């Protein structure tokens, strides 16, 4: 038997060992989209695959994603082009903004939702194909956009009833030159204690030393207590920017914790970074994360240009976040479960010999009532159809037998009470007679 590939899961109409029912996904997505609409953000739909160099340049060659987690291959062109299933959405969104000149005279605020792909060890809430909501705001260097995005996520948590189970952690990475100075000081400090670092941190010391700050190894974390602090290397502008963000968050009533070791796993961030974390899923888990990436647009614009022309490329400010929907749905179901929705409101049961009349009735009802979901079973026995009606979750079952067709009536059964009455054939066509 052919099965789905490890880490690539079906999302069905029923719960499985690896996924919640599709009806819960739809409700979750609808609630998130409502908040996005309220803030005036617009949807974009991006390709699943991009050129590999886009992610290598944007995310960083030394990151875990590029080094170990990307699904990459070549296409059939001549010469072949290296392409990659997208491991995240920001790089593709920035590519689209550049390619279509969306920044010309505008400051677009965009969102996208869909599958991402990373070659990781599958575990609960973390799969090789997973789903993200990504939100990006372009063209503003002001801290108010960062506060707006955090306020948006906070509103989403409130609507989902999980705001008390999430904690906001924030930090400032400063500008590139400030981060480089800190990087040098951190490496110099850790080189003297290299043998005490865990194996992964020893490797990162030469490839991506800032990621050592995010190590989960307790001995490494103990060493970092004595290490230089990034905050001590921030210039006045970066410090003022961060203080303004904290002022805005306080005014919004959003509690936060400054985490000096929060650096994020992608190279393109500068200044503000943030994460929403929870311990409700076992060990502390990140549900949503983001930050500012003012240099990424210029970096991607310069691809293929000479060194002199690349230096002349103007970058644009940008900030965004992404949230993993599998993990978010797990949290929602643990704290404030989404109520399962039935597949239909009205189930039409019809004598097998009268199936054409049943089809016509169901279709006329759908045309008259766009608010109703009307379902029919195949032309099996009445008994078999009634069993399906019982399982459907419908509020009403409409029964069409020979007597009803001849008299122009229908039998309407209220499913939760079992009461069954005869009504005019067009009774359900009027919202005055039956409302959801």
Curated annotation (Swiss-Prot):
Assigned GO CC terms: cytoplasm
A molecular function GO annotation: histidine-tRNA ligase activity
Protein localization: Cytoplasm
CDD domains: HisRS-like_core
Name of a matching Pfam family: tRNA-synt_His
EC number, UniProt record: 6.1.1.21
Gene Ontology biological process terms, A to Z: histidyl-tRNA aminoacylation
Keyword terms: Aminoacyl-tRNA synthetase, ATP-binding, Cytoplasm, Ligase, Nucleotide-binding, Protein biosynthesis
Reaction(s) the record says it catalyses: tRNA(His) + L-histidine + ATP = L-histidyl-tRNA(His) + AMP + diphosphate + H(+)
Gene3D superfamilies assigned to the protein according to its UniProt record, in alphabetical order: Anticodon-binding domain (3.40.50.800), Bira Bifunctional Protein, Domain 2 (3.30.930.10)
Major localization class: cytoplasm
InterPro entries linked: aa-tRNA-synth_II (IPR006195), aa-tRNA-synth_II/BPL/LPL (IPR045864), Anticodon-bd (IPR004154), Anticodon-bd_dom_sf (IPR036621), His-tRNA-ligase (IPR015807), HisRS-like_core (IPR041715), HisRS/HisZ (IPR004516)
Enzyme class, UniProt record, top EC level: ligase
Quaternary state and interactors: Homodimer.
UniProt xrefs under PANTHER family: HISTIDINE--TRNA LIGASE, MITOCHONDRIAL-RELATED, HISTIDYL-TRNA SYNTHETASE
Family: Belongs to the class-II aminoacyl-tRNA synthetase family.
Protein name, per record: Histidine--tRNA ligase
Organism: Psychrobacter sp. (strain PRwf-1)
Lineage: Bacteria, Pseudomonadati, Pseudomonadota, Gammaproteobacteria, Moraxellales
Encoding gene, per UniProt annotation: hisS
């Amino acid at each position: 038997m052919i099965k789905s590939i490890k880490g690539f899961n079906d999302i069905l109409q029923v719960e499985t060992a690896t996924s919640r029912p599709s009806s819960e996904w739809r409700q979750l997505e609808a609630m998130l989209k409502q908040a996005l609409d309220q803030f005036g953000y617009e949807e974009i739909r991006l390709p699943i695959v991009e050129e590999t160099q886009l992610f290598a340049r944007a995310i960083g060659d030394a990151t875990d994603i590029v080094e170990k987690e990307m699904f990459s291959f070549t296409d059939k062109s001549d010469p072949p082009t290296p392409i990659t299933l997208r491991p995240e959405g920001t790089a593709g969104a920035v590519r689209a903004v550049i390619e279509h000149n969306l920044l010309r005279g505008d400051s677009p605020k965009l969102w996208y939702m869909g599958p991402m792909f990373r070659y990781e060890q599958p575990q609960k809430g973390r799969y090789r194909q997973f789903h993200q909501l990504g939100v990006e705001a372009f063209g503003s260097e002001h801290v108010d956009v960062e506060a707006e995005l955090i306020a948006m996520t906070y509103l989403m948590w409130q609507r989902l009833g999980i705001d008390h189970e999430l904690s906001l952690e924030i930090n400032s990475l400063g500008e590139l030159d400030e981060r480089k100075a800190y990087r040098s000081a951190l490496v110099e400090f850790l080189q003297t204690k290299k043998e005490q670092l865990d194996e992964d941190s020893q490797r990162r010391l030469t490839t991506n030393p800032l990621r050592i700050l995010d190590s989960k190894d307790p001995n490494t974390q103990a060493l970092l207590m004595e290490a230089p602090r990034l905050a001590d290397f921030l210039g006045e502008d970066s410090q003022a920017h961060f203080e303004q963000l904290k002022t805005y968050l306080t005014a919004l009533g959003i509690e936060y914790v400054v985490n000096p070791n929060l650096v994020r796993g992608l190279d393109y961030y500068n200044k503000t970074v943030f994460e929403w974390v929870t311990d409700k899923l076992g060990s502390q888990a990140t549900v949503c994360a983001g930050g500012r990436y003012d240099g990424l647009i210029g970096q991607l614009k310069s691809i293929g240009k000479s060194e002199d022309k690349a230096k002349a490329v103007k970058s644009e400010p940008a900030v965004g976040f992404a949230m993993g929907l599998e993990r978010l749905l797990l949290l929602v179901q643990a704290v404030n479960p989404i109520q399962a929705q039935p597949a239909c409101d009205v189930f039409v049961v019809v004598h097998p010999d009268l199936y054409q009349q049943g089809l016509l009735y169901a279709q006329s009802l759908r045309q008259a009532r766009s608010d109703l979901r009307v379902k029919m079973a195949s032309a099996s026995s009445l008994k078999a159809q009634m069993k399906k009606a019982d399982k459907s979750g419908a509020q009403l079952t409409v029964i069409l037998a020979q007597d009803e067709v001849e008299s122009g009536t229908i039998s309407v059964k209220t499913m939760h009470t079992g009461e069954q009455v005869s009504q005019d054939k067009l009774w359900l066509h009027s919202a005055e007679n039956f409302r959801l």
